[in-house]
């Protein structure tokens, strides 16, 4: 619930920021391709994950809305980036079946790949982080019976915390 409220707050913040940018109050920003999640960066800029076009691999990206209202691409070549969260000046991204770590200069690497997970990831969705750096990653699975929640510890160990069941499907 906290994550939902945080994302709602950030969406409102982005809307208010963009509505106040420039002298034209009706200015619309174009160019976002299937925006998914938002996170505030360490400098107050807003970062947006963009899935890109359907069925096109590696057209996903992370965009940054600077405080002056300009938009720039921070990282590109991702599959379908969804959830994003900052920790220690690094942006962590759920990208289809891997967790990606993005430096503020835009370079990125796979932080936790498919083969490291105790259950094979199907469709990573969201991500959050605890104060000790543990990343919590949801995988909606096949949207029917499966779905998982994983903990990716700073040591690199990955634990399965939850597996979907009849009561909760596709977390």
Predicted region positions:
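Bacterial N-terminal signal peptides that target proteins for export
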Residues: 1-9
